[in-house]
């Protein structure tokens, strides 16, 4: 988007050869990215795979939580009850000082494992974010609102301060990923790219959306990891924009029954998931694709660091 601000990208909506309402473009992404109600400088849809793979989720060890007598998280998801309070209950139930040394580290068992600014990622499940696109097509800060601050504090108190969350580099040097695959954490906070490395995992695993703020929250929400999210743009130096945009339209249109179908129906539905419930959750996750303008320029570095400070 810095390139767009510097005048290096074309506004796709200036050309009749592009139509952002076509079904092969990602509707939620288009809504989030359209500036002033008219300007689109990047686009993503069926032609992309990483928009789907970068969705953030919770991966859980089914065998682990069964051994600890936890309630079925799938059922909580489908009943609309997968909330941060219930996530905390599961995490606490699955945490144990295995060696009895009174110090929780990477030799023990944890309710969840993760790395990075977990608070920042988790709050998107609470139907909030740093920015929102308003009705006039202007991104506006929402992180200063009372609702956002209340939800951040709630996530911090409920999840981050649960004494059941293993944070790589803080509680130990073992990676959060190895903690999960070695059966030492019930949940792994990650994105769907993590599934590619779990095909040989001995324990059974499943997929959950980010937990909601409370049961009254209507939908499961979330975000994409923008470091993985790919999109297409047309540079201002392009000598034939209509040809380039027509090519993008055709390729994305044909990708619906080829690339996109194989990603969802072959790779995700059969090779990377192990149960019917995970496939149902993947449908839920597809609706959580979102773009936060906080990732643009210095907003991400400066604003996101605040959440890192809050997490201590």
Question: What do these predicted regions represent?
Answer:
Residues 74, 97-108:
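Acidic, glycine-anchored loop motifs typical of Ca2+
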Residues 1-2, 6, 86-93, 173-186:
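Short helices/loops that flank or line small-molecule/ion binding pockets
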Residues 13-26, 76-79, 105, 129-150, ...:
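Short, solvent-exposed loop/beta-turn-alpha elements that line the ligand-binding surface or hinge
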Residues 261-267, 273, 277-312:
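C-terminal capping/gating helix-and-loop segments adjacent to ligand/active sites or protein-protein/ligand interfaces
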Residues 84, 88-91, 123-170:
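Glycine-centered hinge/linker elements that transmit conformational signals in sensory
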Residues 1-55, 208:
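Hinge/lid segment of periplasmic solute-binding proteins
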Residues 56-60, 64-65, 121-122, 232-233:
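Short glycine- and hydrophobic/aromatic-rich loop-to-beta-strand nucleating segment
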Residues 198-270:
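Extracytoplasmic/periplasmic substrate-recognition and gating elements
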């Amino acid at each position: 988007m810095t390139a767009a601000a510097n005048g290096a990208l074309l506004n796709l909506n200036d050309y009749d050869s592009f139509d952002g309402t076509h079904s092969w473009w990602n509707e939620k992404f288009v809504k989030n990215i359209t500036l002033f109600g008219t300007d689109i400088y990047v686009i993503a849809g069926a032609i992309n795979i990483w928009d789907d793979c970068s969705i953030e989720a919770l991966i859980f060890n089914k065998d682990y939580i069964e051994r600890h007598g936890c309630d079925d998280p799938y059922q909580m998801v489908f009943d609309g009850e997968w909330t941060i309070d219930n996530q905390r209950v599961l995490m606490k139930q699955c945490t144990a000082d295995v060696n009895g040394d009174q110090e929780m580290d990477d030799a023990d068992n944890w309710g969840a494992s993760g790395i990075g600014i977990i608070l920042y990622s988790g709050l998107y499940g609470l139907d909030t974010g740093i920015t929102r696109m308003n009705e006039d097509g202007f991104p506006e800060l929402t992180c200063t609102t009372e609702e956002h601050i209340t939800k951040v504090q709630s996530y911090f108190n409920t999840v981050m301060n649960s004494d059941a969350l293993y944070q790589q580099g803080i509680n130990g040097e073992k990676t959060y990923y190895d903690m999960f695959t070695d059966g030492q954490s019930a949940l792994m906070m990650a994105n769907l790219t993590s599934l590619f490395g779990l095909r040989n995992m001995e324990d059974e695993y499943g997929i959950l959306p980010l937990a909601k703020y409370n049961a009254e929250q209507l939908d499961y929400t979330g975000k994409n990891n923008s470091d993985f999210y790919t999109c297409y743009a047309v540079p201002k130096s392009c000598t034939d924009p209509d040809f380039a945009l027509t090519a993008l339209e055709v390729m994305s249109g044909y990708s619906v029954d080829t690339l996109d179908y194989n990603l969802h129906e072959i790779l995700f539905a059969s090779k990377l998931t192990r149960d019917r419930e995970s496939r149902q959750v993947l449908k839920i996750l597809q609706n959580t694709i979102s773009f936060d303008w906080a990732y643009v320029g210095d907003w991400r570095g400066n604003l996101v660091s605040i959440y890192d400070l809050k997490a201590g």
